Amino acid sequence: MSLLQVLHYPDERLRKVAKPVVDVNDAIRRIVDDMFETMYAEEGIGLAATQVDIHQRIIVIDVSESRDQRLVMINPELLEKSGETGIDEGCLSIPDQRGFVPRAEKVKVQALDRDGNSFELEADDLLAICIQHEMDHLVGKLFVDYLSPLKRQRIRQKMEKLARMTARAEK
């Protein structure tokens, strides 16, 4: 397994729409394993392949405190959603920034697991929010897109400044 580079906003590659996985094979399983390793190293609870510049419909999630309840969703599709909720969301692609995002309280999704088997999952609370957040990434949508233009611009400026400082430090 290896750590993958997480793209940071406003990198335009985060806006690419992911393509469906055609065949769940060893290469896809390696991507899944690397995504989990990266997500845990970054102390995240979810990661979409788009965030690591892999534009396929793959999501990994683990919202457990014990970090041992891995959820793999390949080619996820939202079947149902209900209720309303929302929290101040963060994102590995937008470090140290948060913003309130309205979400459905409950979702029902269909996806393929790590072995290519189809499953359905009903989720609520943090898991439902995380699934919606990660599925947004697969269509090039970020949590900042739900914020006011002013707040989005402030976050963009902070992220651009961070990128400049990081680039200088690497020279």
Curated annotation (Swiss-Prot):
It comes from Sodalis glossinidius (strain morsitans). The active site is at 134. It catalyses: N-terminal N-formyl-L-methionyl-[peptide] + H2O = N-terminal L-methionyl-[peptide] + formate. HAMAP family: Pep_deformylase. SUPFAM superfamilies: Peptide deformylase. Belongs to the polypeptide deformylase family. It is an enzyme of class 3 (hydrolase). Pfam families: Pep_deformylase (PF01327). It comes from the Bacteria. Keywords: Hydrolase, Iron, Metal-binding, Protein biosynthesis. GO terms for biological process: co-translational protein modification; translation. Removes the formyl group from the N-terminal Met of newly synthesized proteins. Requires at least a dipeptide for an efficient rate of reaction. N-terminal L-methionine is a prerequisite for activity but the enzyme has broad specificity at other positions. This is Peptide deformylase. Its cofactor is Fe(2+). Its EC number is 3.5.1.88. GO terms for molecular function: metal ion binding; peptide deformylase activity. InterPro entries: Peptide_deformylase (IPR023635), Peptide_deformylase_sf (IPR036821). Binds 1 Fe(2+) ion. Fe cation binds at residues 91, 133, 137.
